[in-house]
């Protein structure tokens, strides 16, 4: 619901997600003991046809379809779904105190939140397998080395840095251009041929090239001023969008 509301408000340009206190998210609450992962005790999963949908996957799939930048500012330990949910973000930064653990196999379960799709694309298949097989906790510095995160910051500076990064993403760019670009790049992961990307890029170039935003982008450059893009995500997306078959 939160992502729906943000997407419906043209005044909101991006999302920053962080934790409260010393940790980001420690994953599942293990207080139920041996019944922690029993489907009968899961109040968040959704039944669909012949299977029960993982709640983490429902969240990351909504993030995947989101039309605005998502930035994670990991302020502390992120374990289980606390780590896997961040993979659907566009940019992840972390504090020096952050830790990441894909500990699912250690608990006798498997990766959730579509992380078997996201993680190999971010860190590579071999590193993804190593992290999920072993479940070992990695530091923010190792996370940076494997491109799981983009940068490390002092805890007291983390949110300010996240805001600065976000402003760099959105301040000079047209919201609709960002929305289409986000979907083009994410969805190109599953395309088998660059021609598929060429088709969408061509349609998008034609649509955007004829838009008021494109005129404003050129005029603002020539006039050496900041652009004032007026096209809105809620009302001015191109006719060919979405170009993919919608899933739940």
Name each model feature, range by range.
Residues 9, 36, 211-212, 224:
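Generic structural signal for alpha-helix termini and adjacent loop/cap motifs
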Residues 5, 93-98, 149-200, 206-216, ...:
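C-terminal long alpha-helix characteristic of the crotonase
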Residues 61-176, 211, 215:
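Crotonase-fold acyl-CoA enzyme core
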Residues 11, 19-62, 78, 108, ...:
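Glycine- (often His-adjacent) and acidic-residue-rich active-site loop
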């Amino acid at each position: 619901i939160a992502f729906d509301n943000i997407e419906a408000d043209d005044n909101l340009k991006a999302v920053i997600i962080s934790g409260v206190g010393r940790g980001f998210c420690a994953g599942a609450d293990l207080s139920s003991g041996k019944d922690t992962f029993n489907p009968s005790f899961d109040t968040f999963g959704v039944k669909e046809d012949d299977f029960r949908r993982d709640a983490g996957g429902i969240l990351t799939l909504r993030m995947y379809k989101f039309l605005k930048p998502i930035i994670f500012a990991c302020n502390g330990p992120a374990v289980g779904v606390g780590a896997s949910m961040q993979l659907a973000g566009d940019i992840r930064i972390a504090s020096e105190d952050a830790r990441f653990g894909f500990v699912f196999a250690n608990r006798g379960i498997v990766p959730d939140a579509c992380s078997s799709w996201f993680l190999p694309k971010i860190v590579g298949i071999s590193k993804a397998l190593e992290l999920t097989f072993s479940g070992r906790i990695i530091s923010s510095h190792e996370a940076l080395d494997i491109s799981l995160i983009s940068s490390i910051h002092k805890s007291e500076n983390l949110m300010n840095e996240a805001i600065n990064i976000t402003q760099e993403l959105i301040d000079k760019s047209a919201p609709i251009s960002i929305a289409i670009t986000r979907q083009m790049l994410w969805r190109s992961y599953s395309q088998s041929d660059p021609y598929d990307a060429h088709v969408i890029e061509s349609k998008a170039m034609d649509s955007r090239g004829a838009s008021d935003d494109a005129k404003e982008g050129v005029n603002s450059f020539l006039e050496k001023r900041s652009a004032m893009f007026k096209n809105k995500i809620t009302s001015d997306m191109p006719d060919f969008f979405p170009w993919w078959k919608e899933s739940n």
